[in-house]
A protein has these predicted regions:
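Conserved ABC ATPase signature
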Residues: 154-158, 162
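Conserved ABC ATPase "signature" region
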Residues: 81, 132-149, 258-259
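A short, surface-exposed alpha-helical micro-motif characterized by mixed small hydrophobic
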Residues: 221-223
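ABC ATPase NBD coupling module
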Residues: 24-28, 82-98, 116, 124, ...
Length: 269
């Protein structure tokens, strides 16, 4: 299904995050991590949030998911402002909003099988009986390119690429509408990056997923995204269609990111 740009699933408005920083024997000072940014993500779209380390992109992703409280501003999911909701009210949205981390292995308990952990959300949200959970997880493992035998294994037994596939399975098991991808391929070889990105694109088409891709790499955005924004020290300095960012960048930072873009074949092959 094509994205519906007239009907955003996610609407971010003037989102701001300020941390209190207390130094040795000094009064607390304020650090503005994210400074009043706004963007929309259409249903079925992948929106890219590009920035260097420390630019505020991961903090933004966490606020969009209501995993971190915003200092001010709003995030609307289907028209409902989730920044003002209690955790109890947010519970009905949690299964519809999921995240894939840079190192999915770190999100797994090393003492429990990966299959049991992937299936836990089905139990938590009462989406399947205990007798159904294993079969649902096995189906999902198969869909992300893993094997049934992997269900009972532990996270340390898998390669980086396999860990990302497991992280994707864990995120998708609740059949979410919205997925945040936080540097999902940063720690992987280029050939494995391509496999993971192409898997995500296939899954997006199958499931009509809306996605926020957080990355420092404009080549990934070129391959995955419709629209994107560039973050610099917490400020959204440029945003728009990806083609415009690539062909007519307006800021020095965006031009530098364009200059660093890999050949598309290196990502998409």
């Amino acid at each position: 299904m094509e994205p519906d740009f007239a009907d955003p699933l996610i609407a971010v408005r003037d989102l701001r995050k300020v941390y209190k920083v207390r130094g040795d024997k000094k009064a607390a000072t304020e650090f503005v991590a994210v400074d009043s940014i706004s963007f929309d993500i259409a249903k079925g779209e992948t929106y890219g949030l590009i920035g260097e380390s420390g630019s505020g992109k991961t903090t933004t992703g966490r606020m969009v998911l209501a995993l971190e409280k915003a200092t001010s501003g709003s995030v609307h999911f289907e028209g409902n402002d989730i920044t003002t909701m209690s955790e109890l009210d947010m519970r009905r949205y949690r299964k519809r909003m999921q995240i894939v981390f840079q190192d999915s292995g770190s999100a797994f308990n090393p003492r429990r099988s990966v299959g049991a952990q992937i299936g836990f959300a089905l139990e938590r949200f009462r989406m399947a009986d205990k007798g159904e959970i294993r079969s649902r997880v096995l189906d999902m493992l198969s869909r992300v390119g893993m094997e049934a035998a992997h269900y009972d294994r532990y996270i340390h037994e898998f390669s980086g690429g396999q860990r990302q596939r497991l992280g994707i399975a864990r995120a998708l098991i609740t059949d979410p509408d919205f997925l945040v991808l936080d540097e999902p391929t940063a720690a992987l070889d280029v050939s494995v990056q391509a496999q993971i990105l192409n898997l995500l694109k296939d899954l997006q088409q199958e499931r009509d997923l809306t996605m926020l891709l957080i990355t420092h790499n404009l080549a990934l955005v070129e391959h995955m995204c419709d629209h994107a924004g560039v973050l610099d020290h917490g400020t959204l300095v440029e945003s728009g269609p990806v083609d415009d960012l690539l062909t007519t960048p307006e800021t020095a930072l965006t031009r530098a990111l364009v200059d660093a873009v890999l050949e598309p074949a290196a990502v998409a092959s």
